[in-house]
Amino acid sequence: FVAKMDGKIVGHFLFSQFPLSPNADGGHADDSDIVMLAPVSVHADYFHKHIGITMLTLGIQKVREMGYKGITVEGDFNFYNRVGFRTSSEYGIYPTSGYPMTEPRCMMCQETEEGSLKGYGGYVVYDMYYNA
């Protein structure tokens, strides 16, 4: 997804399907109805103009329309909670071992519909970075 103003790209973000593993060591995981949001960027000349919030609001709506159950993100809790993200441990979702979180709130998750993550849980599998 990209945001444009006056024909210039001023921001972008990406959703990728990230499977959950039932154990902290990763390994084989079933396909998931959950996507990860990353990266997100806004051009410095356009900071504090609500571009990030607007982009994410539209993107989250698109993820809902596509039928995904939830979205994970790693980042600034104070920013992402403004668009509905909560600490992922509230949903039983954690990073895999080998990727320690210095601030536990930086791993966040959002349901696409009330209760859509009920019964989900596990560890985000980062293996796709190494197998790309």
Locate each region found by the language model.
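Conserved beta-strand in the GNAT
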Residues: 2, 7-26, 33-41
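Short loop segments at secondary-structure junctions
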Residues: 6-7, 45, 111-116
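Short acidic (Asp/Glu) patches
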Residues: 15-16, 55-59, 89-94
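A short, structural micro-pattern
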Residues: 31-34, 101-102
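Conserved acetyl-CoA-binding loop-helix of GNAT-fold acetyltransferases
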Residues: 37, 42, 48-61, 72-73
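Conserved active-site alpha-helix within GNAT-family acetyltransferase domains
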Residues: 65-69, 75-102
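C-terminal "cap" of GNAT-fold acetyltransferases
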Residues: 94-132
